[in-house]
């Protein structure tokens, strides 16, 4: 493996590759299983980097596809069904997908942030059966450029697989041209034509177009008895989804199928060839069709059309050449970043404004996008901090300020104010609501509190729980850990001893609670952090169960984020539809491999990419790595990520910047 790949993530990559390149989950409909094939935590090594992973196909019928990728990171993905993969290794570099001597079938294609695809009723792809020739799934991923920073990608596709054989089987035909594009032309057409020769009629029901930056329109029609019928047309600069065909179509034996790609080469001073690289172009029209499951497969070895018969295109419909009206909102959504995506380590802070950091236990942003750092100053939580009954032994509050309010620009910080001296015993969680009130949890005093900042003073509004007295009843907490607000209620993770979420009103009055000790859904083994997402749902960090539970405010589990790549999760944060998670400890037995931040997509329960501190390549050249990450937050505009570290003797605040075009 190239030395450039982050050493601290190599173990994670290899674990994911060797243990499983697929995840199988049962959907709410018991007939449907969700089968996911993912990249192995790859970091592209060059421009136009093609890689692939394979996994043995599970028998069934695919009725839907969920992509798990973003155009910031991935140029496109192609999912194939293969009799044999091109390599037996499970992962390989290069453009090969299916092996020689067997079938090669396109099942799905994705680019430019295309959405999910659900097939029509009674239509599905047959996979994993002897007669369909698909024994393996192969996912090919094209990365346009290397990432910035130490980012590792787990993009993939989730298939919804049923065991019920449908009335109609699905397949995909690819129309592809190899004609070069001359320079300085406002409109150049690449044409493709084939004759349909099977006795099994086919019914197109969806289509997808694909070009690179020069493409302006891709269309396809078929000709029956001298009459042209449109299959579809679309601007390839829009999200490259499979668009449904509204009318019922049938292509029969002897019909002509044709496609055309329109290119604009006015800004080119050389001929542009067709090819897989970014400097090349592509002319692709994907036609998804179904046929009667009782009839023979019309394309038993895979469906492709790559011929050009100019004489047969003379009467191609004018509509197939005419541009569609501009759709700026689609072009923006489909935008592929020209700036390499990355999460770059921007700074490591060991002191802020002359204040040496203690263990950084909590982080929060206020309404001015200033960061509140909740740190323990000179007090350290170790084996001598509590007795066997969870009672704090040093009952004096921390004299030094424990809340540091900072502003930041680039890697420079400014200490705006210092708060909380003499008011806290062992800081843990902190949150600032939309009204500017500050909420804290203190594991030393076993309390939850609401505060108001007045100048350089921290004024207490109320305190919930009995000072320095742990308990599990309705009036006590035992080492409460995190707090967040959703609408007019507060949600407290309680915590190290009680394995519950306590719900308060804004005046600190208890309303209810949910959660029990355990590892089932809705149970906890040390709920360590809690945040809310943009929809007002909760993300509870279930630390020792090694997961984040995505829950309603009533405590019902929507999904969980869990992986073999970590055994514990200390903190989580949410921005838009992404969930950021950080373990506090490496996997036992692999302590030298380091720790990474994992990022999943809401609604999937899967990890989509990971990142960590900067490395310089070889192990002996590695820079500072995470010690014991304890808290993580993403700034409100999504541009920065901060991680608080409580490692003994190495308390730090890590600062990362998310790089993409919007920055």
UniProtKB/Swiss-Prot annotation:
Region of interest called Peptidyl-alpha-hydroxyglycine alpha-amidating lyase, as start-end residue ranges on this chain: 301-663
Keywords: Copper, Disulfide bond, Glycoprotein, Lyase, Metal-binding, Monooxygenase, Multifunctional enzyme, Oxidoreductase, Repeat, Secreted, Signal, Zinc
Binding site for Cu(2+) A: 75-76, 142
A molecular function GO annotation: copper ion binding
Pfam families, sorted: Cu2_monoox_C (PF03712), Cu2_monooxygen (PF01082), NHL (PF01436)
UniProt entry tagged with the keyword Signal: yes
EC number: 1.14.17.3, 4.3.2.5
Alphabetical list of InterPro entries matching this protein: 6-blade_b-propeller_TolB-like (IPR011042), Cu2_ascorb_mOase-like_C (IPR014784), Cu2_ascorb_mOase_CS-2 (IPR014783), Cu2_ascorb_mOase_N (IPR000323), Cu2_ascorb_mOase_N_sf (IPR036939), Cu2_monoox_C (IPR024548), NHL_repeat (IPR001258), PHM/PAL (IPR000720)
Positions that bind Cu(2+) B: 210, 212, 282
Residue numbers binding a protein: 376, 496, 543
SUPFAM superfamilies per record: NHL repeat, PHM/PNGase F
GO CC terms in record: extracellular region; membrane
PROSITE patterns: CU2_MONOOXYGENASE_2, NHL
Cofactors named for this entry: Zn(2+); Cu(2+)
Cofactor binding note from Swiss-Prot or TrEMBL: Zn(2+) is required for the lyase reaction.
Ranges: NHL repeats: 411-454, 464-507, 511-554, 626-656
GO biological process: peptide metabolic process
Residue positions the entry lists as glycosylated: 191, 269, 411
Paired cysteines (S-S): 82-98, 194-305, 261-283, 478-497
Subcellular location: Secreted
Domain of life: Eukaryota
PANTHER family hit by this protein: PEPTIDYL-GLYCINE ALPHA-AMIDATING MONOOXYGENASE (PTHR10680:SF14)
Family classification: In the C-terminal section; belongs to the peptidyl-alpha-hydroxyglycine alpha-amidating lyase family. In the N-terminal section; belongs to the copper type II ascorbate-dependent monooxygenase family.
Subunit structure: Monomer.
Protein name, UniProt field: Probable peptidyl-glycine alpha-amidating monooxygenase pamn-1
Organism this protein belongs to: Caenorhabditis elegans
């Amino acid at each position: 493996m190239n030395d450039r790949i982050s050493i601290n993530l190599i173990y994670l990559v290899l674990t994911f590759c060797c243990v499983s390149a697929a995840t199988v989950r049962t959907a709410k409909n018991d007939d449907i299983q969700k089968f996911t094939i993912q990249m192995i935590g790859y970091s592209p090594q060059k421009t136009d980097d093609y890689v692939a992973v394979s996994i043995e196909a599970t028998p069934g019928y695919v009725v839907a596809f969920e992509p798990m990728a973003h155009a910031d990171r991935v140029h496109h993905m192609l999912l194939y069904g293969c009799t044999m993969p091109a390599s037996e290794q499970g992962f390989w570099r290069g453009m090969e997908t299916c092996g020689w001597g067997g079938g090669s079938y396109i099942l799905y294609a994705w680019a430019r942030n295309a959405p999910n695809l659900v097939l029509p009723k009674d239509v599905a792809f047959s996979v994993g059966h002897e007669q369909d020739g698909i024994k393996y799934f192969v996912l090919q991923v094209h990365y346009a450029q290397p990432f910035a920073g130490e980012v590792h990608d787990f993009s993939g596709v989730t298939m919804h697989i049923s065991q019920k054989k449908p009335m109609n089987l699905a397949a995909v035909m690819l129309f592809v041209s190899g004609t070069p594009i001359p320079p300085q032309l406002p409109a150049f057409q690449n044409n493709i034509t084939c004759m349909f020769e099977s006795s099994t009629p086919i019914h197109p029901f969806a289509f997808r177009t694909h070009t690179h930056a020069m493409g302006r329109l891709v269309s396809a029609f078929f000709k029956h008895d001298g009459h042209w019928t449109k299959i579809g047309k679309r601007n390839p600069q829009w999200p490259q989804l499979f668009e449904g065909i509204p009318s019922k179509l049938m292509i029969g034996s002897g019909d002509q199928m044709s496609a055309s790609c329109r290119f604009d080469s006015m800004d080119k001073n050389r001929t542009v060839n067709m090819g897989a690289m970014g400097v090349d172009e592509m002319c692709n029209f994907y036609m998804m069709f179904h046929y009667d499951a009782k009839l023979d497969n019309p394309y038993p070895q895979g469906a492709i059309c790559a011929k050009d018969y100019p004489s047969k295109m003379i009467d191609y419909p004018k509509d197939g050449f005419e541009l569609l009206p501009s759709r700026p909102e689609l072009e923006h959504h489909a935008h592929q970043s020209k700036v390499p995506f990355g999460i770059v380590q921007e700074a490591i802070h060991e002191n802020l404004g002359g204040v040496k950091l203690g263990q950084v236990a909590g982080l929060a942003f206020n309404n001015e996008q200033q960061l509140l750092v909740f740190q323990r100053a000179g007090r350290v939580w170790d084996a001598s901090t509590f007795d066997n009954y969870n009672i704090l032994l040093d009952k004096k509050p921390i004299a030094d300020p424990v809340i540091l309010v900072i502003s930041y620009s680039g890697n420079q910080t400014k200490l705006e104010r210092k708060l909380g001296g003499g008011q806290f015993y062992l800081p843990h969680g902190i949150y600032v609501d939309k009204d500017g009130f500050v909420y804290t949890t203190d594991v030393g005093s076993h309390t939850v509190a609401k505060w108001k900042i007045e100048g350089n003073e921290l004024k207490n509004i109320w305190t919930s729980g009995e000072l320095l007295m742990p308990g599990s009843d309705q009036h006590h907490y035992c080492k409460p850990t995190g707090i967040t607000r959703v609408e007019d209620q507060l949600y407290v993770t309680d915590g190290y001893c009680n394995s519950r979420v306590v719900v308060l009103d804004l005046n600190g009055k208890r309303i209810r609670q949910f959660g029990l000790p355990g590892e089932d859904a809705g149970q906890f083994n040390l709920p360590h952090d809690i945040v809310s997402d943009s929809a007002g749902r909760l993300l509870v960090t279930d630390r020792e169960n090694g997961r984040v539970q995505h829950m309603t405010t009533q405590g019902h589990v929507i999904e969980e984020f869990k992986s073999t790549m970590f055994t514990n999760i200390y903190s989580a944060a949410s921005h838009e539809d992404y969930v950021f998670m950080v373990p506090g400890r490496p996997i036992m037995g692999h302590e030298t491999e380091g720790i990474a931040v994992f990022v999943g997509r809401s609604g999937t329960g899967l990890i989509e990419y990971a990142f960590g501190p900067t490395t310089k390549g070889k192990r002996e050249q590695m820079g500072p790595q995470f010690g014991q990450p304890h808290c993580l937050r993403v700034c409100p505009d999504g541009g920065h990520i901060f991680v608080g570290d409580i490692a003994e003797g190495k308390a730090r605040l890590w600062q990362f910047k998310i790089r993409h075009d919007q920055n």
